[in-house]
Amino acid sequence: MTLFEAIVLGIVQGLTEFLPISSTAHLRIIPALAGWEDPGAAFTAIVQIGTLVAVLLYFWKDIFIIVAAVIEGIVQRKPLENSDAKMGWMIVAGTIPIVIFGKLFETQIDTTLRSLYWISGSLIGLAIILFLAEGKIKNRIKKELPLKAMENIGWKEALLIGLAQSIALIPGSSRSGVTITGGLFLNLDRATAARFSFLLSLPAVFAAGLYKLYQTWDIIVASPEHITNILVATLVAGIVGYASIAFLLNYLKKHTTTIFIAYRLVAGTAILYLVATGVLQP
């Protein structure tokens, strides 16, 4: 991997990590179209640490309040008395499914599921599901039924959205895409679904990044070039990711997810066509 490739892939990661269009799919397809080597699942997981930092910086006040409340609750032996502490524990509980499934299917995630057939199928399939979720929300708005804000999220919502997050282990599905979709099905308003999605990502992305960093450490440190490329890609991903968070949260306050649904359908269909015509190898 060249420094130029690292910068491009960092931009791609930052742009697509938080938009419901799948960063993994783009990190797989763009190198294939450009004739570059597949950076691999390990590269993707490590560079996600950059976007993790973007979430930490953007939501630092929320995170500080939640962590402080959790610690206070533990000290006072009343872990769930405070709503902020409860949110912290719900995020932890919502992370458990993806940790379990991620470990169980680690080999398939790193190999078989990176096939362009899987990626295109995930892009199209989740677009259809997001379309159905969007229709459900539009129907509630039309009937003037209430939608849930952050303070209305309970254990049911946290656990079900956490379970939905496990689907993101399939490249092409999009972690933010499946969690936002899950939130919409559970009647969260669009901006709240995105906000909770980003907070829920923290433990999973951090754990996956550290795990892959540990697994590939010897390869990374074997070459100064590898170290430089990883650091640059991670830094760029963080900077671009911060802007992506701000964009999506503001966008979803006034707009639907229709543009992302359309993009996923077009991208998934285009990938299938390119594979079928031999332009890309699956």
Curated annotation (Swiss-Prot):
Keywords: Antibiotic resistance, Cell inner membrane, Cell membrane, Cell shape, Cell wall biogenesis/degradation, Hydrolase, Membrane, Peptidoglycan synthesis, Transmembrane, Transmembrane helix. Bacitracin is thought to be involved in the inhibition of peptidoglycan synthesis by sequestering undecaprenyl diphosphate, thereby reducing the pool of lipid carrier available. This is Undecaprenyl-diphosphatase. Pfam families: BacA. GO terms for biological process: cell wall organization; peptidoglycan biosynthetic process; regulation of cell shape; response to antibiotic. Catalyzes the dephosphorylation of undecaprenyl diphosphate (UPP). Confers resistance to bacitracin. InterPro entries: UppP (IPR003824). Its EC number is 3.6.1.27. GO terms for molecular function: undecaprenyl-diphosphatase activity.
